[in-house]
Amino acid sequence: MEPSPAAGGLETTRLVSPRDRGGAGGSLRLKSLFTEPSEPLPEESKPVEMPFHHCHRDPLPPPGLTPERLHARRQLYAACAVCFVFMAGEVVGGYLAHSLAIMTDAAHLLADVGSMMGSLFSLWLSTRPATRTMTFGWHRSETLGALASVVSLWMVTGILLYLAFVRLLHSDYHIEGGAMLLTASIAVCANLLMAFVLHQAGPPHSHGSKGAEYAPLEEGPEEPLPLGNTSVRAAFVHVLGDLLQSFGVLAASILIYFKPQYKAADPISTFLFSICALGSTAPTLRDVLRILMEGTPRNVGFEPVRDTLLSVPGVRATHELHLWALTLTYHVASAHLAIDSTADPEAVLAEASSRLYSRFGFSSCTLQVEQYQPEMAQCLRCQEPPQA
């Protein structure tokens, strides 16, 4: 069957295999999906256009990165290069100045480099298709990279905290105020440059493609919720935190430069900035643990999803409802829908899938439709999970 010219933007897939051509189920399935008469299929089934409610939210994306992701990758490359160069400079400057505060700032930059490299690696992996072993693809590589970045920051910060404690106990150390002031000033400039690079606007988003990273809501009073590129946004917020820390180190270096007797400001600021650095990892660690523990996606509640499914005409009950996230923006849902005997399973499936996609922005939904049985009300496995 040749696809209709008006069916632009629909997903290309296979309807039936050659061995199903003679089956009545395949004919009924085709008849329920298309209104115009279909021509006999050739010996080998050809890919044809499928309507939205077949099973997927979006058309099959083109191979490679979208323009938005390409722009995000360029931003991350530039910011990562700047961050690495100035991190190396801070390590050298901190060593020459004998400043733990500078080293703490360099450790924070090290975490930034690791985070951005993990984001770049995940952007590259996201172009690889799913396999029979990795059926979900490689989406969680970004989560693992974020976890590695947090662990590395904790290790380096722990060492610096120990050294700062030793310095407070024993005052036999000397701070080179000039070298510390110069290094801290360069660090502030580096963070300003990285913030400028990451804050640059990307190309205009394209409609009808998931690469634009928009979570469409239902048409009505609410507007589409722009998500942007999560990796770039996270890096930008992280750089803003580094900028505040760099200003603090700069203030401590100015004090030590003009008042060398106040050299204790170096280990004291190391304590303060280490606490800030560890605290900044709390949101990332919370998101990582929630994803790895198969928790519900952030900003998606169990009750709203359940109520949305129960509001579909013909649905009497729902059970086995599971919501989880592969990444912060790739959300998945699965559920069993118990329907009335008079309800059309195809219509219920199409309507329920459409509501989940449009209202919550799920990337993948798997729904099983079954006849409602009275004993489901007493079945323990059909009950809702308790509130956490």
Swiss-Prot record:
Transmembrane spans: 76-96, 106-126, 146-166, 178-198, 236-256, 265-285
- Please state the protein's primary subcellular location: membrane
Q: Where is this region: Disordered?
A: 1-46
Membrane topology designation:
Multi-pass membrane protein
Where in the cell does this protein reside? Cytoplasmic vesicle, Secretory vesicle, Synaptic vesicle membrane; Synapse, Synaptosome; Late endosome membrane; Lysosome membrane
Q: What molecular function terms (GO) are annotated for this protein? A: antiporter activity; metal ion binding; zinc ion transmembrane transporter activity
Question: Which ranges make up the Lumenal topological domains here?
Answer: 97-105, 167-177, 257-264
Fetch the NCBIfam families from UniProt. Answer: CDF
Give the family, as the similarity comment puts it: Belongs to the cation diffusion facilitator (CDF) transporter (TC 2.A.4) family. SLC30A subfamily.
The record's function comment reads: Probable proton-coupled zinc ion antiporter mediating the import of zinc from cytoplasm into synaptic vesicles and participating to cellular zinc ion homeostasis in the brain.
Describe its partners and assembly state. Answer: Homodimer. Homodimerization could regulate efficiency of zinc transport. Interacts with TMEM163.
Q: What is this protein called?
A: Probable proton-coupled zinc antiporter SLC30A3
Q: Which organism is it from?
A: Pongo abelii (Sumatran orangutan)
What lineage does the source organism belong to?
Answer: Eukaryota, Metazoa, Chordata, Craniata, Vertebrata
